[in-house]
Structure formats: structure tokens, C-alpha cells
Amino acid sequence: MNLQEIRNFLKDLFSKPLGDGKKRHIVFWYDEAEDFIEDIDTFDIENVKVIKLNENNAFWTKYYIEKEDTTNNILVYSNMKKPKPQEDWLYDIFSYSQEFSTDRATVIMRELKVFDPLLKPEFETYNVFFKNKDRISAFKNLNIQNYTKEKIHIGILASLTKVKIMDIEEIIKAIIKDYIDGSNKLYENIKKFGNEDALWELLEKYYGYSFEEKSIERFMSMLLVTNMNETIKFELPKSYVPFISKKTTNCVVFINHFMNSIKDNEYYDKMQELVATKIKINNLLEKHDTDSFIECDVFEVIDKVILTRVITLLNDGLEDYEKYLNILLTRRKLYYYNKYVSEYKAIKWAINILNKKKALDSSIKSEKAYDMVKSYIEKYYYIDKSYRKFYYHYDKCQWKDEIKDLKKTVENVYNNWYLQELSIKWNSSISDLQSWRIDGVKQQDRFYRENIKFKGKERVYVIISDGLRYESAEELNTLLTNERKGRSTLDYMQGVLPSYTKLGMAALLPHNNIEINDRYDVLVDSINSTGTENRDAILKNENEKSLAITYDKVMDMKDAEIRKTFAGLDVVYIYHNTIDARGDNESTEREVFAATEDAFREIILLVNKLVNRVSAASIIVTSDHGYLYKRSPMEESNKLSSVKLEDGEDGRRFLLTSNNEEIEGTITFSMDYLLGEGSSKYVITPKGTSRFKVQGAGANYVHGGATLQETIVPIIKFKNDRSASSVNEIRKVKISLTSITRKITNIITYLEFFQDEKIQDKVISQRIKCYFEDEEGNRISNENIIIGDSRSENPVERTFREKFVLKSMQYDKTKKYFLVIQDDEDVNGYYERIPFNIDIAIIDDFGF
């Protein structure tokens, strides 16, 4: 600054408005270099008294300012070095005054209220940084307390990386994210306006970066390899060893926070992919057993390798199914599981199919019809369920090419073993029947009489979901059990034959007789049973306080309307059509399993609405029929030539006719069982899973035939519980910390947790995350996920041992730190904050 600039600057300084109760301006100017010692006498600033401070007049100066002249503005000039506060006679005056300096570092220090002269070299290092008002403002906004050299460096880095807190972890993430975006602007700004060496010194201090080359990519590689090394069970090759940091814990915590941050994890994904390719992680994994890296989730390729290996083992026919399921279970709580959740679940359900085949010794037993029905509802249905769940998840896979061979295995087992074996044995058992009715099995056409008619004053809601199979209802029953306070039970009945909508819907209505006229309309007590209006009339014939209505109409009703509509009624039939609507359409039949999941959600929404809006206490969910579905194309050998009928109704799975014909590959039943003796109507259905040839596409989803999948119709009975009793309340299992100690003495520590009870009806799983934080809520450890879903009676199998890695930092043993345990699926769910003391004397990665 030249003399005129100084005069102008001082003039502005003394002209500033007074604040904080001040009556005048006092400014100190230490000119140690004596650059202006000869000019000070020529300074003539209006209303400013200039005092020259030297070694001998400090006491006089103090006396003059405080006693003799208490009104004028004063400039105290000294050609001495600025004294330390403890050696400064005038420090009390200086502390409430302003300081003028011709060097930028001093000006900035004074502005920031930094009075330690030992820090001046650090500020001088950043002269270029402090030339910009925006950068100064960003630095000020960090509100740094108790300045140190390191805090200055971190503050500069935070300002340049646009991080608003003093956190080296956040600074590094910002630099990495910018680098991954291809910009690298933040790092260039550090080189231009900051101190590149200071950054790398901090990376060495906190993360152990020891390479000579200042490389962001090497640093990222070090973080990831160090983390990998902590969770694998084999020794890394020599070429990887330089990338293993000695500051293990900070690297582990950094990566854990990075991948678990919702706003940052997309950058983590890009980072790990970049590094995995560079250091050839795939080649490394090929040399080792899956068990040796089963708990490592640092690189996405690990999940791909594990999935590929399990698929290969399954396709090769190796039957170690429990081991494969345990592999999938282990991966559930790890980072990339959610990305590949559909693949993992598809594989799980494929394993369940294969495992069930193994449990059955690859054999479906020959039994009488009644026993076959019992075997189906107890064990065989599970294969249909597993097939449905496999395809539901397979259709959502992003990695279909890799899983398509497993699909072939599933198709082979389901079609060529299960459906074929089951249909052969079932056809054999029903061939002995004199009538379609199986003794001892509830009948669909007696549904109203047995479930509705004698309910007395209790209003009953019946939800009829078109195409809801028994295997699907088993899952829905579990969902209802765990959705609401109440009791839900599953039963079954033998559906009518042919198993198609027109007849199944009629069978569920109250009736004295069912007829099929010459046009093959189904009449209930002489009323055509097709359509909601006709069904409403049939219901009212039995009980005038009845109503038939569609699902969509109910769901569209406002609260007042639904209460008014249902007021005074005894019986409400609600017709729901999601599964059959999608399955029975050639363009959407592939979506039938997704439609089933949609149906679950819709039915649960309906149940909730009925309970909450009209206080429904008794709800029944049933169906008109089931269906057969296979994903693979129908073979020509599985199609029967179409039959021309003089009269009748036909479909891919049945012929309904007045002609009692013998057709090869079919089985025939008289309709007398339903229509009454002398009906002169017959149902002809292909044996097994064969279809009649019919023009057009859409042969994969069919119903109308006599298979167990088509004709075992579910009955779910849900009783809502409005009592104060807790018997039917739904609760999550509790996962509690069981470790007794509340003192941590090692930077790596293990804690034990316990699932308090097994999973069962009304007791559902809980997924929690747990981590340590300080009093201000800053995370200081990695995050662990615990999934409490064990069904075991054995307490040992409900115990979890989790590894916690603390940041390498100074801990205050007089302060409290907290283990946070919180529900990972519900922000309003379970939360616990358990106080701990951390007493680690000298911090390194071994805790000593």
C-alpha cells in the first residue's frame, strides 16, 4: 500500500459508524518493518490524534487514552513488533480497538479475532485466498473456534470445496465427487487459491495416504482396498499391499458413511466401479472361494460374482440348498443387496422350488382324491407359490441375461416334473370319482349356506377376487394377519367344474338351484347371474338387506357415502378383478404374477377401508376359480385338437356341452353334481395341463379345467379385533443391546444384540441400523444393519455380534458418546440412544 492508499483507508476506518456503545475509534498500527516511520508525522486526519508508541511510553500512552483524552479518535502507531497479549501493557485497550496493518494476514487475523501471532505464517500462506470477499465470507461462516494451524487448513479447504462445516470427511467427499463428475475444478481451486500440500498432509494424517504421487485415484483406491482387506478372509496379493492404509479405521468409517449417504451413494457407485476396473477386482475374486469374501460389500462386482456362482451351482444340479440360502441371507444387510434385490429374491425362490423337490424325493405320491387335496394345501401349493414369486422377481431383474439359464432350470422342474407328475397323479385319483364332488371337502356351491346364511346380526363383507389361487391366498392371509389387529384364518373348498368365472361366481351366490340354459347362461333361481346388478338381485332374493358392488365403486366412495351405502345391510358382496383381468388377456397374461401382488395391495386397502370407515368386523375373501400358468411357450404336443360342438360353450381348458362324448386325452364329468339329476350337461376337460387348440394367442394363462391349481378355491376369514386386549396386536420383534459394558477402550469393538422372540403370527421382523455418535449427533463409527427375522426357538440363533469401528480421533472420557439403535424402515419407529464412555488413551488403529 502506498501512502495515499493508507491515508484513504485510515480515513474510511475512522469514519465508520460507532457500535457496541463506543464513543470513539481507537486504531493500533504496528509497523515493525518501519516502512512508514518517516511519514507518520505528516499524517493529518481530521479529528484523529496520533500517538507514537515506543518501548518507554506504554504506561503514559495507557494513561493518556484512559484518563487525559477520552473523547478524540486516536491512532496508536508503533515501529515495534506487535507484542504477545501476555506481554502487552495496552492489551486491554487493544482488545476493544481495531488494528490496522499494511499486510493482509494481520488484517484478516484481526477481522477474524485471531490474536495468536504464531498463526500469522499460516494466514500469510493463504494471501491469495483472502483477496476475494466471497471466499473470506465462506471462511467466516464456518464459525471456527479456538484457531489452530490445522483448523485454518481445514477451513480453507472447506471454503474452496463449498463444504459448510469443518469436517475433513465431507471435504474429501466433495473433492471425490467433483473428480468423478470429470470436473476436478475443486482440486484445481485448492492448487490455485489454497495449499495443495496441506491437503495431502491431512490425507496422510487421517487416512494414511503415503504415496509420493498426489493422485485422487490412488487415494480412492487406497480407501476401497483398505476396506476390502478388513472384510475378506484371504491375503491380498503383493500388488495390492501398498494400497492398504495404516489408518484402517478412518478408511472404514469414511467408506461406510459414503455408501450409506442417500445424497452421495451414486458417487460411491461410480467411484468403486472406476477403481474395481483399474485394479482388476474381478480377476482377484476368481481365485478365491465365495466364503472368503461373502461379507465384503465394497465393490459391486462382488455381488455379481456371488450371484453368478450360485446360479451356476444350481444349474449344475448341486443340491447344497441351505448353504446357498445362507449366502443370500448374509448379503441381505450389505450395500449392493438393494440394487440386486430382484436377482437375489428370484434365486431364493428358484432354490425353494428345487429344495421342495428334494424334500419330496422328486416324487408326487399316488393318493385318493381327498388325500391329494390335503397334500396340495399342505405342501404342493408351495411350488406354485415359489414359481409365481420367482417370475415376479425375475421380471424386475436388470440382469436377465445372467439369470436366464436359471430360468430354464426352473421351467424344467416346474413344467416337466411338478406339473406333469402332479397332474398325472391327480387325474388318476379323480378318474375314480363317480361325481366331481370329493367327499369330505367343502364345496364352493355351498359357500353362502355355510359361511353367510346363519351369521345372524353380524354384517358380513365378502370380497370375491377373480382368479385368486389358493397359493396366493396363503400369502395374502399372512399379510392380513400381520397388517391389522384381528385374526385371519385360511380354509379351502373344491371349486365348481368347469372352473370359469360365469359358473364360479354363480356358485358363490345364495341359491336353491343353478341352471344352464340353451344359450349357456348360468341362472341362479331363474336369474342370469352375470353382472353386478343381477348378482345384487339374487342376493336380495335371499336377504333384502344385501348389496353387490364392485371394488372400484367402494374405493371411489367418500366416507359419508360409504357409511350411507352400507348402513343397515347384513351382507355385502364386493367384486374385485385384477388377477383375471390381466391374466385372461393375451397382451397382459405375462403380468399375471405382478397382478397378484397388486391384488394383495388392493385387497388390504379395501379391508382397511372397511374396518376404518364402516367398522367392519367380519370379512371373507374368496375366489371364483384359480388358474394354470406357465411362462414357457406351449408345446404342440400339449395341445388337443379343437372339437366342433353342435351346442355348448368352450375354452382352452373345457367343453361344456349336452353331448356326452368320448374324446381322447380328456376326462368327462356330468354336470348333475351341480345342476341336479338329469341335467343332460357334461363338462369335458383335458387331462393334466393340456389345452384345446383355440385360435389366437394367450394359451399360457388358462382356467376352466380340473387341476388342483384351478379348482382349489381359498376362503380367508378375517375377524377384526376392536377390543382393548393386546392379544391380536401386531408388533415388531425387539432387538436389544445385551452387552453389559458401557465403556469402550478399543477403537474396534464388538457388541452383542438379541432378538427377543421368534417371528410368528402377529410378531413381525424388524430391521435396525446402529452406529455411534457424539453429543452433537456427529457420527463417529460405521453403521451396522441387523435384520431380526429368525423363526428359531433357540436363543443362540437370535443373537447378533456386530463389529463397530470408531474414527481415529481424540475422545474425551468425561463426555458421553451414544450408540444409536433405530428402525431402518420407519422413521417414526423404534429409536434408542444408549450412552457410552470412550476411554482410548492414544489413538491409532489398534487403540493404543
Q: Could you say what each language-model-derived stretch is?
A:
Residues I463:
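Beta1/beta-strand and adjacent pyrophosphate-binding region of the FAD-binding site
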